[in-house]
Regions:
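N-terminal leader/linker segments that precede catalytic domains of diphosphate-processing enzymes
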Residues: 1-74, 79-135
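NUDIX/MutT-family hydrolases
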Residues: 139-163
Length: 163
């Protein structure tokens, strides 16, 4: 079974992301119960094969501005707009706006558990997409300072990230 097939079918719980939360941040499931009207948002995790058949994803570094997410390393994404039919659409639209990945590129694989982002009161849902080849990207300089390709192997083995 390849990674994508495995990932499609693995059982995930609501709090599987907890080990990655910053120290002191409340569990998302608990925080969401106490928050009033968190804003829906979505990010796209675009996975693709790179050198030697290894899988990679993109991160972005947000541009510097007078906002709460200035300069952050993140997945491309943002808030749901009133005319977005659903959050998958939001993830695709935001990825197109920020890094130029066409809204029709990438096979939708699955969503991951929503995470509460306290600084902006976002309930953020990650959506995972697979591409047969590395997608062509063009970053929106107003929103994105740089696009950072990252091999999944470097995450698994905690290797230094080169960009």
């Amino acid at each position: 079974m390849d990674f994508i097939s495995y990932f499609k079918h693995i059982e995930l719980t609501e709090d599987d992301h907890l080990p990655m939360l910053p120290m002191g941040r409340a569990r998302s499931s608990e925080a969401l119960k106490t928050m009033k009207s968190p804003r829906e948002s979505a990010v796209g995790i675009h996975c693709f094969p790179c050198a030697a058949g290894k899988l990679s994803i993109f991160l972005i570094q947000r541009s510097e501005y007078q906002g709460k997410h200035s300069g952050q390393i993140a997945f491309p994404g943002g808030k749901m707009e009133a005319d977005d039919p659903d959050l998958i659409y939001t993830a695709r639209r935001e990825c197109y706006e920020e890094v130029g990945i066409s809204m029709h590129e990438g096979e939708y694989i699955r969503s991951l558990s929503p995470v509460y982002i306290p600084v902006s009161n976002f309930k953020m849902t990650p959506y995972f997409f697979y591409h047969e080849t590395q997608p062509i990207t063009i970053h929106n300089e107003r929103e994105v300072q740089q696009i950072i390709p990252l091999s999944l192997e470097s995450l698994a083995h905690q290797l230094p990230i080169e960009h």
